[in-house]
Amino acid sequence: MNSGQLKKIAVVGLGYVGLPLAVAFGKQVETIGFDLDQRKLENYRGGIDPSGEVNREEFLAAAQLEFTSDPGRLAEAEAIIVAVPTPIDEARRPDLAPLTGASRTVGANLSPGAIVVFESTVYPGCTEEICIPILEQQSGLTWLGGLDAEAESGKPGFYVGYSPERINPGDKVNRLETIVKVVAGDTPQTLDRVACLYERVVDAGVH
């Protein structure tokens, strides 16, 4: 794995979690903001966030952020952050359809060596049991975090990180920049790279 600083990232899902994240990263690094909702993207390109989470000045400051609905653009990213919702159904069970759909889209457009970071709120084991097999199936690549260092060398694959979102919609005090970010990675190197990435936008630091 290249241990250098990530030069281009993507954020998948531009709701109340993904949009502030994409805008924050867009001030620091080349960022692709991906969503399938064309009306939402048109608003964002015009500097308008109907939810009020991001203001026009913040959009303008994110000079390196580009919005798109083209999944093929995800192949350009060295790290892809999945920030789609995981709503609860009437039986209070998590609806994983947005997450599995996003995993399929990411997997089909995943470049070797990339890191996929899940921000979506999920139950323990969900990432490894559900998301990673989808990524492997769709990409034809191997999850390298599940292999030892010797087997990892020279094998085309991808890595996985996790950083649970902690944003409270509408809260103007406790924002992305001011809340300590918890991060995890499937290898020590993945953890280091994910931590360094979030440190660029989270003033409160990472843990």
Predicted regions mapped to residue ranges:
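Aromatic pocket-lining residues of Rossmann-like dinucleotide-binding sites
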Residues: 25
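N-terminal Rossmann-fold NAD(P) dinucleotide-binding loop
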Residues: 18-19
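Glycine-rich, N-terminal phosphate-binding loop of Rossmann-like dinucleotide-binding domains
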Residues: 82-85, 120, 186
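Glycine-rich Rossmann-fold phosphate-binding loop(s) that bind the pyrophosphate
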Residues: 14
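Rossmann-like NAD(P)(H) cofactor-binding subdomain of soluble oxidoreductases
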Residues: 88-166
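Conserved N-terminal Rossmann-fold NAD(P) cofactor-binding segment
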Residues: 3-8, 30, 36-79, 85-93, ...
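Internal alpha-helical scaffold of NAD(P)-dependent oxidoreductase catalytic cores
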Residues: 134-163, 167-207
